[in-house]
Curated annotation (Swiss-Prot):
Pathway recorded for this protein: One-carbon metabolism; tetrahydrofolate interconversion
PROSITE patterns, A to Z: THF_DHG_CYH_1, THF_DHG_CYH_2
Free-text function comment from the UniProt entry: Catalyzes the oxidation of 5,10-methylenetetrahydrofolate to 5,10-methenyltetrahydrofolate and then the hydrolysis of 5,10-methenyltetrahydrofolate to 10-formyltetrahydrofolate.
Stored PANTHER family: C-1-TETRAHYDROFOLATE SYNTHASE, CYTOPLASMIC, C-1-TETRAHYDROFOLATE SYNTHASE, CYTOPLASMIC-RELATED
GO molecular function: methenyltetrahydrofolate cyclohydrolase activity; methylenetetrahydrofolate dehydrogenase (NADP+) activity
Family label: Belongs to the tetrahydrofolate dehydrogenase/cyclohydrolase family.
Protein name: Bifunctional protein FolD
Taxonomic lineage from the root: Bacteria, Pseudomonadati, Pseudomonadota, Gammaproteobacteria, Enterobacterales
Gene Ontology CC annotation, any one: cytosol
EC number: 1.5.1.5, 3.5.4.9
Swiss-Prot/TrEMBL keywords: Amino-acid biosynthesis, Histidine biosynthesis, Hydrolase, Methionine biosynthesis, Multifunctional enzyme, NADP, One-carbon metabolism, Oxidoreductase, Purine biosynthesis
Lineage top rank: taxon: Bacteria
Length: 283
């Protein structure tokens, strides 16, 4: 069996194109353009790439982006004061803080200061709480993008045994909540999980987000499983790989996402979609 490759890059392009048409329509109606404020702290190379990719897409489709770059020495209070200022600016629709932040800054304290209706990443406790209560408003971008991909390929999630590897607040935890909403039976594993292999071997849907290059061998994959690889890792050779051994897993899975070109583009597409959702709600 050779898995069908889920092309997130192409699907993300289609989503962005539809949003572009909406932006042009709103412009003809005399509406102001949507806007996104992005805050980056420090010189993390990966963060710079993510920010640059977001800026390029915003510029391409006519969505205004504002980038606030700070050194790693910025104080937490200065960062919070900027967020409070952006909260009050009616010309700013969405606000995001690029993660990770320096360890000296309390991440939750900062994210909580973004008002929920401008929380484009969906990380505010209010928005996560809505997701827990089955009444989502703004959904975190990566889990939202994964569900969108699965639905695009008409994969029936109802009743599937889903295993999420990684329990981060960004992907693993909200992903498990999204899967519950879709009717999956969900197991979430983490660094304290004993015998991880046992769980993965029983997964009909496997979602991996741990940031460890090719950590999951193909031999662990259940034949016919759907494999979603969120990881993005650079090997010493310079090659970009995911958290799953792609070359082996593709021979056992029924569907699989590549790295790069799988989940990454969809995450950005969902960020743009969330921004437009906030724009329409708040206009």
């Amino acid at each position: 069996m050779i898995a069908k490759v889920i092309n997130g890059k192409n699907i993300a392009k289609k989503i962005i194109s539809k949003i572009n048409l909406k932006i042009k329509k709103y412009s003809k109606l005399g509406m102001r353009p949507a806007s996104l404020a992005m805050i980056n702290v420090g010189n993390n190379p990966a963060s710079k790439i993510y920010i640059s990719n977001k800026e390029k897409i915003c510029k391409k489709i006519g969505l205004i982006s504002y980038l606030y770059n700070f050194s790693k020495n910025i104080s937490e209070i200065d960062l919070i004061n900027l967020i409070i200022k952006l909260n009050k600016n009616n010309l700013i629709d969405g606000i995001l803080v690029q993660l990770p932040l320096p360890k000296e800054i309390n991440k939750l304290n900062v994210l909580e200061k973004i008002i929920p209706k401008k929380d484009v990443d969906g990380f505010h406790p209010y928005n996560i709480g809505r997701l827990c209560q089955r009444k989502p408003t703004i959904v975190p971008c990566t889990p939202k993008g994964i569900i969108r991909l699965l639905k695009y390929y008409k994969i029936n999630l109802l009743g599937l045994n889903a295993v999420v590897v990684g329990a981060s607040n960004i992907v693993g935890r909200p992903m498990s909540l999204e899967l519950l909403l879709e009717g999956c039976t969900v197991t979430i594993t983490h660094r304290f999980t004993i015998n991880l292999k046992k769980y993965i071997e029983n997964a009909e849907l496997l979602i991996v987000a741990i940031g460890k290059a090719e950590f999951i061998p193909g031999s662990w994959i259940k034949p016919g499983a759907i494999v979603i690889d969120v990881g993005i890792n650079r090997l010493k050779s310079g090659k970009i790989v995911g958290d799953v051994n792609y070359e082996d897993a593709i021979e056992k899975a029924s569907y699989i996402t590549p790295v790069p070109g799988g989940i990454g583009p969809m995450t950005i597409a969902m960020l743009i979609e969330n921004t437009m959702q906030i724009y329409i709600n708040n206009y």
